[in-house]
């Protein structure tokens, strides 16, 4: 993980507190209104969304269960509950929600991506890789799909394949720093020092402070000593 300067950390903490307070205020207001309109799907979805942002998974699931009791084909309800079930490590339930969602909206990008990543997390490795490969076939211009496959390959130690996929993701979304950072990490792991230096220079030109990249430079120096 990249280090963050102390001042930036303090500012980030302050912003997070203010944001959490605003979310809690919105949540409290929605809860009060919901007491008078218990069958409002829209209100329950809004409340669940705020619960999710506050990482209150059980509360979010309760509201999403009620949404889907009222309308078992509600697309937003299925998508959010799949996400929440995954966070609660209820993988089989999450998988079922994604599968039901794909019955309603065949080929949906987010549902297919969520299902592939869930299968990877739940060690259904063949299904995960087949799923992400199918997604890329359907959405060949999606940087997110290539990055997701790169992430899977990186976790499995398939570094050369992962490097290719992150490079492809970067070519499709040149301004995404996360893709570039993962790509640099892979280049260093593969011993491709000059390529890594080139990518680091590109990040600095895009405004990233050199101090935030010091861990990468340290790793490159360590390679030279070996």
Residue ranges and their predicted role:
Residues 53, 87-88, 121-122, 155-156, ...:
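Register position in tetratricopeptide repeats
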Residues 11-14, 21, 186-226:
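Terminal, low-structured helical/coil segments at or just beyond the last alpha-helical repeat
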Residues 41-42, 75-76, 109-110, 143-144, ...:
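Helix-start (N-cap) detector for alpha-helical repeat units in TPR-like alpha-solenoids
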Residues 46, 80, 114, 148, ...:
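Canonical tetratricopeptide repeat
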Residues 32-36, 65-69, 99-103, 133-137, ...:
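Conserved structural position within tetratricopeptide repeats
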Residues 6-58, 62:
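N-terminal leader/linker segments that initiate helical-solenoid repeat arrays
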